[in-house]
């Protein structure tokens, strides 16, 4: 069964995500309050699976993905559409940046994802693409390393559905656990922006989790040294 994705917002992230999903074979409705703008963008992208529409048309899709800033009134914009969200998978890409991208407009003990889940308790919120800057979508591979996307949710079934939707897109997707982990991921994105600007990478940078298998019970190579000094 074909899944339609409704993207609300025609900024840099919304357009990149619409392009990515449409290229992946999903039907996408790019929703905007300015229909002429949405049609112009959809025509310019020239993708068979992409059409333009209103916010209402996008919100009526099987999966919704609002691409707006919290600081610009995301929650207020979505409030009149809340009846579309009941029992629907909502992909949250929001980061609660302030106007200067130097801090967040939310306190440490919450996240954009949690605020959305609180505002729309019947939506099945899945946080994803929070750690990805817009320019990375054009080429998600750095050298031989494919960029990671951290995916969080308290709804295991909704998370699995999103992971299935993105399976053939050009990123590696990491199951990053519960929705509250969005607090950490959003702040990691804030840090990556600062580091990227400091070292001249912004906005062409991303995270990648590196590691190698570790055998359970394998001894630490310096365990005997640590054990001989238990008080330090």
Regions found by a protein language model. Give the residues of each.
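Rossmann-fold NAD(P)-binding glycine/threonine-rich loop
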Residues: 94-135, 139-141
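NAD(P)+-binding Rossmann beta1-loop-alpha1 motif at the extreme N-terminus of oxidoreductases
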Residues: 1-44
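Rossmann-like NAD(P)-binding element
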Residues: 46-89, 93-100
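Active-site-lining helix/loop region of Rossmann-like oxidoreductase modules
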Residues: 147-232
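General beta-strand structural signal in soluble alpha/beta enzymes
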Residues: 51, 124-128, 174-176
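A glycine-biased structural micro-motif
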Residues: 39, 60, 86-87, 122-125
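Phosphate-coordination loops involved in phosphoryl transfer and adenosine-cofactor binding
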Residues: 1-4, 87, 146
């Amino acid at each position: 069964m074909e899944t339609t994705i409704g993207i609300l917002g025609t900024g840099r992230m919304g357009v990149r995500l619409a392009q990515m999903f449409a290229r992946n074979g999903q039907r996408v409705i790019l929703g905007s309050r300015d229909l002429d703008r949405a049609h112009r963008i959809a025509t310019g992208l020239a993708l068979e699976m992409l059409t333009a529409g209103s916010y209402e048309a996008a919100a009526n899709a099987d999966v919704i993905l609002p691409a707006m800033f919290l600081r610009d009134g995301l929650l207020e914009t979505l409030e009149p559409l809340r009846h579309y969200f009941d029992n629907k998978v909502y992909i949250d890409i929001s980061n609660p940046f302030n106007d200067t991208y130097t801090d967040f407009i939310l306190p440490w003990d919450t996240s954009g994802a949690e605020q959305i889940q609180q505002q729309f308790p019947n939506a099945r919120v899945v946080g994803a693409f929070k750690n990805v800057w817009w320019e990375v979508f054009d080429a998600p591979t750095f050298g031989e390393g494919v960029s990671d996307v951290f995916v969080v949710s308290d709804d295991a079934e909704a998370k699995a559905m999103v992971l299935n939707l993105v399976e053939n897109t050009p990123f590696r997707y990491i199951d990053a656990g519960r929705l509250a982990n969005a607090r950490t991921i959003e702040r990691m994105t804030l840090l990556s922006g600062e580091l990227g600007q400091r070292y001249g990478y912004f906005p062409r940078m991303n995270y990648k989790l590196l590691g190698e298998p570790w055998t359970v019970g394998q001894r630490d190579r310096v365990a005997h040294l640590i054990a001989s000094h238990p008080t330090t």
